[in-house]
Amino acid sequence: MNDLAKVDFSNGPMVYVGEEISYSEIVTYWKGKSMREAFVDQEVKGEQLQKLLRKKYELIQKHLQALVGERELFNFMKQFKQSHLFMRPDFEELEREFNTRFHVNLREILDYYYEGKELPALFIRDLKVELYEEDEETKNIGSCKIYNPTSVPAVVTLSVATYSMGDNEIGSGLRNYLIPGHSCKEIRADLG
C-alpha cells in the first residue's frame, strides 16, 4: 500500500506536541513571519514548530473548504486516494486534478500560506441570532457583517448544524467563510 493511502486527510497530519503553546503565542509568532522562515528558525523547538505548522495546516484546510465546501473537499481527497492506491502520485498530479475539478489554483493558495507574512484583521458588526419557524420546524439563524481591511484573505469559522456527507460520514458542524482582503461580507447560517 502506498503512503498516500495511509494518510487520514480528515484529521490533518499527526502532530506530537510537547510544550504547550497558547493561541496568542501562535498568532504572535506568525505575525510578520512566513512558513518559509519558520522552517529555518533556530529559536523554535521541534515540538513547537509542529504545533505552529498544524495551525497553518488547519487554516489552509479551512480556506479550501470555504472555496469548495467541506463535503466536496472530503469527497475529492477520498476519490483521489482511492484512484491512486498502490501508486506514488506526485503533488503536481494532485494539483492538476484539484484545479480541474474545482477551477481553483491550489498552488497559488499554498504559495500564499508558505510565503505570506501578513495576518488578517477583522471587524464584526450586527452580530445576531434570530429564531426562524416554518412548518413546525424551528431554526436559529445567525448573521453578522464582517469587514477585512487588510490585503490578505481571512477565514471565519462558525459552528453550525451538522449534516451527513454520505458513507456514514458526518460534517464537522463547522462552516468556513472566506473574507477576501479589503472586502466586507454578510454571513447567514443555520446554527441548528
Regions found by a protein language model. Name each.
Residues 1-63, 67, 84-85:
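Acidic/His/Gly-enriched intrinsically disordered linker/tail segments
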Residues 6, 99, 103, 181-182:
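Short, flexible coil/linker elements and helix-boundary hinge sites characteristic
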Residues 42-124:
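Amphipathic alpha-helical substructures
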Residues 48-49, 96, 127-133, 143-148:
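Generic recognition of flexible, low-complexity loop/linker segments
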Residues 91-93, 125-129, 171-174:
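Short, charged/polar low-complexity linear motifs in solvent-exposed/disordered segments
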Residues 117-139:
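Extracellular ectodomain segments of secreted/surface proteins
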Residues 133-192:
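Beta-strand-rich binding/interaction modules
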